[in-house]
């Protein structure tokens, strides 16, 4: 998917990018490739692949109608090089985006990236989701939490649901169907008062299958969740 293919496909979906937005995606690509030689951000660095498998893939929840261009508070867990939240932010500038990442070098990249792209209302924090999930400044504060290929739902639910407001939504982007994952996550979702409200499949323009699972938070998360850093992965609920 060339940049021109990307613009044209978005236009067909009803999103006509401004010259500023096109420049932002171009700068994003160039900085991603430049910084990838210093720190491991992605295995995908070829321009057409980045536009398809990072940029287009990241904005899929918008294209599929699951997000609006409103000043909602969105948290991205395990965003790595900023996916999916920063391509979403370029497309929908009204989003207020927060990223938590456990690697300080990635936070340095994201901070520079946001400055170079001229993004406002973006916040980056270095640390573990399990620790921030017990911090009152973060816990129960977000309308949406996104996670792209971060962990299985059984683990992911504990890392994300505590951050949501009641009726807030987890949007999980997956490369594989999540049926088995959701079966395994039933207990975790029950304990965390999360309910799967949508399982959506779609295709990238090249025909690759992708999946979005949306979980809504129904009640306050019990205080003991999330557990200490590392435990959700070692001993899933």
From Swiss-Prot:
The keyword rRNA processing applies. Its main location: cytoplasm. It comes from the Bacteria. It is found in: Cytoplasm. Its EC number is 2.1.1.-. GO terms for molecular function: rRNA (guanine-N7-)-methyltransferase activity. Pfam families: GidB. Keywords: Cytoplasm, Methyltransferase, rRNA processing, S-adenosyl-L-methionine, Transferase. The keyword Cell inner membrane does not apply. It is an enzyme of class 2 (transferase). S-adenosyl-L-methionine binds at residues 78, 83, 129-130, 148. One of its GO terms (cellular component) is cytosol. Specifically methylates the N7 position of a guanine in 16S rRNA. Belongs to the methyltransferase superfamily. RNA methyltransferase RsmG family. HAMAP family: 16SrRNA_methyltr_G. NCBIfam families: rsmG_gidB. This is Ribosomal RNA small subunit methyltransferase G. It comes from Streptococcus pyogenes serotype M5 (strain Manfredo). The lineage of its organism: Bacteria, Bacillati, Bacillota, Bacilli, Lactobacillales. The gene is rsmG.
């Amino acid at each position: 998917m060339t940049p021109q293919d990307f613009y044209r496909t978005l236009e067909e979906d009803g999103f006509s990018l401004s010259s500023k937005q096109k420049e932002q995606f171009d700068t994003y690509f160039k900085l991603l490739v430049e910084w990838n030689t210093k720190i491991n951000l992605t295995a995908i660095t070829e321009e057409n692949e980045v536009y398809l498998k990072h940029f287009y893939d990241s904005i899929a929840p918008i294209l599929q109608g699951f997000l609006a261009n409103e000043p909602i508070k969105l948290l991205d867990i395990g965003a790595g090089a900023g996916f999916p939240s920063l391509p979403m932010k370029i497309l929908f500038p009204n989003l207020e985006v927060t990223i938590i990442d456990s690697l300080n070098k990635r936070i340095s990249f994201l901070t520079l990236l946001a400055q170079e792209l001229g993004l406002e209302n973006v916040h980056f924090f270095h640390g573990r989701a399990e620790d921030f999930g017990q911090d009152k400044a973060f816990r129960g504060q977000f309308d949406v939490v996104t996670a792209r290929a971060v962990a299985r739902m059984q683990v992911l639910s504990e890392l994300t649901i505590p951050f949501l407001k009641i009726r807030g939504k987890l949007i999980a982007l997956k490369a594989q169907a999540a049926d088995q994952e959701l079966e395994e996550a039933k207990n975790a979702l029950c304990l965390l008062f999360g309910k799967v409200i949508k399982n959506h499949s779609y295709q990238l323009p090249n025909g690759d299958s992708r999946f979005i699972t949306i979980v809504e938070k129904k009640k306050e998360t019990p205080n003991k969740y999330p557990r200490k850093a590392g435990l959700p992965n070692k001993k899933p609920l």
